[in-house]
Amino acid sequence: MKFTLVATVLLTFSLSAFAVEYPVLTIASPDQVGFDSQKLHRLDGWIQNQIDAGYPSINLLVIKDNHIVLQKAWGYAKKYDGSTLLAHPIRATTNTMYDLASNTKMYATNFALQKLVYEGKIDVNDLVSKYIPGFKDMPGDKIKGKDKLRIIDILHHVAGFPADPQYPNKNVAGKLFSQSKSTTLEMIKKTPLEYQPGSKHIYSDVDYMILGFIIESITAMPLDRYVETTIYKPLGLKHTVFNPLMKGFTPPQIAATELHGNTRDGVIHFPNIRTNTLWGQVHDEKAWYSMGGVSGHAGLFSDTHDMAVLMQVMLNGGGYGNLKLFDDKTVAQFTRHSPEDATFGLGWRVNGNASMTPTFGVLASPQTYGHTGWTGTLTSIDPVNHMAIVILGNRPHSPVANPKVNPNVFVSGLLPAATYGWIVDQIYGSLK
């Protein structure tokens, strides 16, 4: 009996000795962690000027040394209904949820992959065909190589796929047209390569659509259920979901995006296209029409606090509090720049050369990594300065500047606030 008791005590002590307790975020004043508060405050006026000039809204949060030192919202979550300015626009708050667009790639798909790699359930050198049956070259394909594509090739964006096949738009997609998830997977298999794999980088949504399907194959769960139940819920995140309107959230909690659906103010048309102001539905066309709102490349919504926790997980080397999702070796593996391009890690964008200045500014360390999203979102994680910045915005919630010339340029996209690096530099420049 004594031996059993002693053994139990020793085992408990042994396990507790190896338990990892990761830092959790607390709130501190900027001065407490090395910022000049007066300099940092200047950013407030500059962002407000951008809002006054027509930028819809900006939510900003800054982390330094495990502390939230700045969290603020400017502008409006919804100011238009169609082309009509609302008499009483809805103000953005620090709790407003935003369509993350391509930041979904990192904080849903990459987080899931990093967890699965750490758990030994997948290897980045595995062939894609191991998880997606029928993923192979098609008769008549001019460029061959699908059979040999590895997950690491997909993550590095060197797999040969086009940037945006526009599956839901039959006028563009042609035989690859799809507005259902099951058909979309078959169309991805049939999508011809545009260049020889490994010969160059082409940032492609298709790559991350494939990765989403791979995660579902391994886990036997829909992507949204997997990340929401095994990552977000254990972290205590309450505002990070796919398809928020189907999960208890209401439009006033969410920032609106494009004014006239996906029509770019009336110049784009295809079957089932949305025409009302988008509010609580993912903006991305492939994610909405072709994937039902849940895709590896887009579809995730979140707020700045939840994003701060996810960025802190990365700064911590894979955990938060008493929760371990992956380890520091996995973080290093995924954020190390590729041999071919210093600006690409495994999915993550890395501050590897001057081409990333518009994203990360000129003052962040070369080891900084993160991602951007088409709707106006940025995440920047700097392990050298133990610092992270998240900017969430709803840039498409403004008129298209000139629909006939370029339907993808919005009036707000012409403002300086659309260049994240300037904001990032003002934050770094406020360090003492």
From Swiss-Prot:
TM stretches of this protein: 7-25
Which cysteines pair up through disulfides? They are none
* Localization: Cell inner membrane
**Catalyzed chemical reaction(s):** Preferential cleavage: (Ac)2-L-Lys-D-Ala-|-D-Ala. Also transpeptidation of peptidyl-alanyl moieties that are N-acyl substituents of D-alanine
Specify whether Transmembrane is a keyword of the entry. yes
Keywords, comma-separated and alphabetical: Carboxypeptidase, Cell inner membrane, Cell membrane, Hydrolase, Membrane, Protease, Transmembrane, Transmembrane helix
- Signal sequence span is none
Can you name a GO cellular component term? plasma membrane
Q: Which domain of life is it from?
A: Bacteria
Q: Which GO terms describe its molecular function?
A: serine-type D-Ala-D-Ala carboxypeptidase activity
Q: Which biological processes are named by the entry's GO terms?
A: proteolysis
What's the protein's topology in the membrane? Single-pass membrane protein
Q: What is its EC number?
A: 3.4.16.4
For the keyword Cell membrane, the answer is: yes
Q: Which Gene3D superfamilies match?
A: DD-peptidase/beta-lactamase superfamily (3.40.710.10)
Family that this chain belongs to: Belongs to the peptidase S12 family. YfeW subfamily.
Name-wise, this protein is Putative D-alanyl-D-alanine carboxypeptidase
State the encoding gene. yfeW
